[in-house]
Amino acid sequence: MKKFLKVIWGIFAVIGILFTVRVLFLLNGNTTISIYPSTKGRFGEYVELLRNSGPFSKDTVSLEMKIVQDSVRAKEIRDYFQLDKLYDADADTWTKALAIGKFVATNIPHDNQEIEPEHRNAIDLWEYTKDVAPAFNCRLHSILTFELMLAAGLDARFVTCMPFDRYDNDCHVVNEVWLPELGKWAMIDSDMDGNYASDLDGTPLSLREIREHYISGEKMQYHPEFGKATTKLSMHYAYMAKNTYWFNCWETLSYYQEDGENRLREAGRDIYLVPSGFDGFGIREGGIVTTDADAFWAAPRK
């Protein structure tokens, strides 16, 4: 009997040790053990890839980055989400964009959904979180945020941010909003609790500027959960270093952009911005590859 009890206590001891180790990993923000270096651990490698990449340069590809408004659909979305309660009517563009980003990030957590939504538009995605699953991935976050910004009268888009490594299956999708007050784009991420980047003066940065800061080594601040700024090597800081090697965006954007009901997607072009000397990979049929960063980040046309 004593031997039996000894075995039982031994089993409980092992379980206790494993539980303690598991808790320690969770407290440190890790949910799995990996034989590969973490994203933060590879930050220097990602920055070197950016620094060794070819420059962006003008080419012969003609681009017309365009945003198409639909007043009827805009009103439907404003009324459904009661957007006028999120911000003051006379607020500036960035204040409105932040309010929308916070709204999405607060209400919808990140997850890689097991069931794909039947429709990819703001209202149906919101209904999906109530009826099917409460969370979804970065692309769906960005589509929802894009349509809310568009309904609020903001010029916005969603951009796929991609790594150098063709065997890295992880990319990230974020939004950019055009700030007419500053004459520039600004990145805003409504996924993973929300985030944006700024220079040390607090001016929000575009994806182009974020990439340039990594290359130059100039300090910038990330604002996790749209809150207090930090220059520390956070997960976001390292993650975006990996995923700002090249970019993808639709040339023309509007509501229902990646929904079966949309017609613009069928006629629109898929634009890929790559550094010189890099061919990209996984380019969709009909996609346009360019090295012209000025055209890619030009003011949107209407």
Q: Where are each of the predicted segments found?
A:
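N-terminal Sec-pathway targeting helices
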Residues: 1-17, 23-24
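Cysteine-centered nucleophilic/redox motifs
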Residues: 14-17, 100, 104, 131-160, ...
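Membrane-interface motif at the C-terminal end of an N-terminal transmembrane signal
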Residues: 16-36
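A structural boundary/capping signal
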Residues: 26, 31-32, 147-150, 259, ...
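N-terminal pre-domain segments of enzymes
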Residues: 34-44
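Secondary-structure boundary elements
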Residues: 42-136, 299-300
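Hydrophobic/aromatic-rich core segments of domains that either
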Residues: 143-216
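Low-complexity, Gly/Ser/Thr/Pro-rich intrinsically disordered linker/tail segments
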Residues: 216-302
